Amino acid sequence: MNFSVGLGRDDAEKRLVQNGVSRRDFMKFCATVAAAMGMGPAFAPKVAEALTAKHRPSVVWLHNAECTGCTEAAIRTIKPYIDALILDTISLDYQETIMAAAGEAAEAALHQALEGKDGYYLVVEGGLPTIDGGQWGMVAGHPMIETTKKAAAKAKGIICIGTCSAYGGVQKAKPNPSQAKGVSEALGVKTINIPGCPPNPINFVGAVVHVLTKGIPDLDENGRPKLFYGELVHDNCPRLPHFEASEFAPSFDSEEAKKGFCLYELGCKGPVTYNNCPKVLFNQVNWPVQAGHPCLGCSEPDFWDTMTPFYEQG
């Protein structure tokens, strides 16, 4: 897989077809991204244009203290597959999980990308350990915070994918022995935060498209694009009518839960969580609450501490 050259519209569409993705599916995905951005169906061609442009910007994707779940969520999306849609149409010059290079060759690729004359956009996955000069988190013999600081200094823009890079994530949970922090807090830089554990790839793709077509989106006080994180999960939940009728499931295996009764008394954090999960779903198929699991509030800062216990006795 070639990550260094954008395919262009014709070649990109051929690649999609070869991977079993029809143009109809591709445009449907673009329409979903457009809708998530708060735009009408007429904006879908603009999304398609941004994703199949011949000359793509350089992207450096750093992994810090994390589980790689955000990458896994992104590369396992369907219709169209993210490798055919995104990874082949941007100049993804460094991404440890999927790049072919390893060891010194990988480090050389990172150095080359950071010194490129055309600049780059930085994607960060994972929190930053800060204690003892960041030595609790090392990659290639360098503290994660040192490498990220260097990359952030010249970046055209910084997108934090996942709650770990946005706010510190599970590494920051009490007692936080490594003094982990999110990128913005640790480095004092402005970031576009796409939180979630993992975040919906639609929100990540939408943020990328917005940056390429319209610039930095309007952000809330926590650095999240209001386009994707402007409404409470609760307000768009299909179980909301049952909440308003005070119809609560007494247990996860109850008939009431199967009938769609509200999961609030079982620990659902939808009433205090900003995200668009009920609207865009995961892989356009399902999302936790619809599947019978309470919202954990994973797109909120410090949710590992502030949203626990995740489950309550009904």
UniProtKB/Swiss-Prot annotation:
GO CC terms: [Ni-Fe] hydrogenase complex; ferredoxin hydrogenase complex; membrane; periplasmic space
Record: residues binding [3Fe-4S] cluster: 277, 295, 298
Signal peptide: 1-49
Cross-referenced SUPFAM superfamilies: HydA/Nqo6-like
GO MF terms, alphabetically ordered: 3 iron, 4 sulfur cluster binding; 4 iron, 4 sulfur cluster binding; cytochrome-c3 hydrogenase activity; electron transfer activity; ferredoxin hydrogenase activity; metal ion binding
Residue numbers binding [4Fe-4S] cluster 2: 234, 237, 262, 268
UniProt record, GO biological process: anaerobic respiration
Cellular localisation: Periplasm
Positions of disulphide bridges: none
InterPro entries with a match to the protein in the record: Cytochrome-c3_hydrogenase_C, NADH_UbQ_OxRdtase-like_20kDa, NiFe-Hase_small_C_sf, NiFe_Hase_small_N_sf, NiFe_hydrogenase_ssu, TAT_signal, TAT_signal_bac_arc
Maturation and modification: Predicted to be exported by the Tat system. The position of the signal peptide cleavage has been experimentally proven.
Binding site for [4Fe-4S] cluster 1: 67, 70, 164, 197
Top-level EC class: oxidoreductase
Pfam families the UniProt entry points to: NiFe_hyd_SSU_C, Oxidored_q6
Cofactor note: Binds 2 [4Fe-4S] clusters per subunit.
Keywords of the record: 3Fe-4S, 4Fe-4S, Iron, Iron-sulfur, Metal-binding, Oxidoreductase, Periplasm, Signal
Cofactor(s) needed: [4Fe-4S] cluster; [3Fe-4S] cluster
Catalytic activity, EC: 1.12.2.1
Catalysed reactions, semicolon-separated: 2 Fe(III)-[cytochrome c3] + H2 = 2 Fe(II)-[cytochrome c3] + 2 H(+)
NCBIfam families linked: hydA, TAT_signal_seq
Quaternary structure (record): Heterodimer of a large and a small subunit.
Family: Belongs to the [NiFe]/[NiFeSe] hydrogenase small subunit family.
Described function: Involved in hydrogen uptake for the anaerobic reduction of sulfate to hydrogen sulfide in an electron transport chain. Cytochrome c3 is the physiological electron acceptor.
Protein name: Periplasmic [NiFe] hydrogenase small subunit
Biological classification of the source: Bacteria, Pseudomonadati, Thermodesulfobacteriota, Desulfovibrionia, Desulfovibrionales
Gene transcribed to yield this protein: hydA
